[in-house]
């Protein structure tokens, strides 16, 4: 998915897990930020300009140290305002974990964010960290959600390290369609997520090679995909008027296996990066509307850095294994117009036939969401990032084009740093696509211009 991938690592990676500030052997260091932001979009129904999001936010970031072998990190966010035409007042513990490091062996326990993958905009290997692509924040890293996990690591010499992660608590990502208005008769029932039994946990293994000439990694993941599928429950129709009464669906988690690899190779001022992954569901996807097909996904990019300009150009592709064409149009609705042509063609509409028709539509919608309606997908992307006037003015222009679906994503922004710690940022996040594409569905709701002011301390 393009938008969710647009917060990948590389150019935009700024997680607290990787970069909390410390000062010598201080027992506790404090930092954080205060941010105000406003997003202007169009209402989904009448397409009138409105405040899509307007909020004030405080982030408090702490790092504590106990001797030379124990550290603890916390990132706490407070946010108040309005979003998607609803008031918000929330407290979020984004990260809170403890690290123990003794010699080559380390342990981490708690809630943290550490995505897999080295790509800038697409990370096929990142199945372990969930995301919220509807997040209204000028910092793309805020789309990453924390997981509660136990991680152990062992250094095998100067360049190799093995990490094993066990995540017993399922943390779903947020679907792009969450802010999209649905017909009144479409009901999302309580989600079907795994419990806290030990055999419901997920685990991942990562082998890192960090050498002067090469940065590479191998990955294995066995657990629940962070994106739940949309499962069909039931459909009720008035048989006299053929009008829908209720379409009941629910989010349902499913388990996958994933194997992947990536590498990054610096050559002078150039960096060559590639990443690829294979995954399949542990259950057969045949006739199960919420399960995706097995797939191979892969990306390759070239980065060139200069004195004031960085250019990243890349390719992202997918191959859908065991592909078969969808049997219906992708839809999360069941209107009268969908059944009348069948009746006029002589088909006898029974409850069983209606269930099959609606289930096939939901299956196609899941494939639309997962980009599996076609056997192959090809996308290209370009990121331009310029720094001017001694790094007081920054311009960033990420662009993505999907050749298969003819969809666009553009997220230009300009940042001004008039004083130390102060950033004023303005930009636009836009998604466009033709009829029956995901961007055509979510773009009119998510597209927005924004301005934010952030003071970091």
Description of each model-found segment:
Residues 143-311, 315-317, 324, 443:
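Signature for the C-terminal beta-barrel architecture of outer-membrane proteins
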Residues 32-34, 74, 109, 152, ...:
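Membrane-embedded beta-strand positions of outer-membrane beta-barrel proteins
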Residues 223, 267-283, 290-400:
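Detector for outer-membrane/organellar transmembrane beta-barrel domains
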Residues 28, 68-72, 104-107, 159-162, ...:
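Repeated loop/turn-to-beta-strand initiation elements of outer-membrane beta-barrel proteins
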Residues 36-42, 78-82, 102-104, 113-115, ...:
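Transmembrane beta-strands of outer-membrane beta-barrel pores
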Residues 382, 443-457:
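Outer-membrane beta-barrel "beta-signal"
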Residues 63-180, 208-212, 433:
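Outer membrane beta-barrel
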């Amino acid at each position: 998915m393009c938008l969710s991938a647009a917060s990948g690592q590389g150019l935009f990676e700024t997680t607290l897990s990787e970069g909390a500030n410390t000062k010598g052997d201080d027992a506790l260091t404090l930092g954080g930020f205060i941010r105000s932001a406003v997003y202007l979009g169009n209402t989904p129904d009448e397409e009138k300009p409105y405040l899509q999001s307007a909020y004030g936010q405080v982030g408090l970031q702490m790092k504590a140290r106990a001797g030379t072998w124990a550290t603890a990190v916390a990132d706490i966010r407070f946010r108040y305002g309005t979003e998607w035409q609803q008031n918000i007042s929330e407290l979020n513990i984004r990260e809170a974990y403890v690290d123990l490091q003794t010699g080559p062996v380390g342990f981490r326990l708690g809630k943290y964010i550490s995505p897999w993958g080295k790509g800038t905009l697409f990370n096929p290997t990142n199945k372990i960290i969930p995301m919220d692509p509807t997040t209204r924040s000028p910092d793309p890293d805020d789309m990453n959600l924390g997981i509660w996990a136990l991680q152990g690591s062992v250094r095998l010499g100067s360049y190799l390290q093995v990490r094993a992660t066990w995540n017993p608590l399922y943390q779903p990502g947020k679907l792009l369609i969450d802010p999209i208005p649905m017909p009144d008769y479409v009901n999302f029932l309580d989600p079907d997520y795994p419990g806290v039994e030990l055999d419901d946990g997920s685990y991942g293994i990562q082998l890192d090679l960090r050498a002067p000439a090469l940065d590479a990694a191998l990955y294995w993941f066995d657990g629940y995909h962070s994106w739940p599928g949309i499962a069909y429950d039931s459909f009720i129709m008035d048989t006299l008027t053929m009008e829908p009464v209720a379409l009941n669906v629910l989010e349902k988690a499913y388990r996958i296996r994933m194997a992947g690899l990536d590498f990054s190779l610096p050559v002078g001022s150039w960096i060559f990066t590639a990443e690829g992954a294979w995954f399949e569901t542990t259950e057969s996807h045949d006739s199960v509307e919420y399960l995706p097909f097995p797939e191979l996904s892969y990306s390759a990019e070239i980065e060139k850095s200069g004195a004031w300009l960085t250019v990243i150009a890349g390719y992202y592709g997918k191959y859908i294994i065991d592909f078969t064409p969808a049997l219906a149009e992708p839809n999360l609705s069941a209107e009268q117009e969908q059944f009348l042509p069948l009746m006029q063609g002589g088909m006898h509409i029974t409850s069983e036939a209606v269930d099959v028709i609606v289930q096939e539509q939901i299956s196609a919608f899941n494939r639309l969401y997962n980009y599996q309606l076609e056997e192959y997908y090809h996308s290209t992307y370009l990121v331009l990032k310029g720094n001017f006037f001694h790094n007081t003015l920054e311009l960033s222009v990420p662009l993505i084009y999907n050749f298969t679906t003819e969809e666009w994503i553009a997220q230009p922004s300009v940042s001004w740093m008039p004083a130390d710690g102060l950033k004023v940022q303005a930009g636009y996040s836009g998604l466009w696509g033709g009829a029956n594409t995901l961007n055509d569905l979510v773009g009119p709701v998510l597209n927005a211009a924004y301005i934010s002011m952030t003071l970091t301390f």
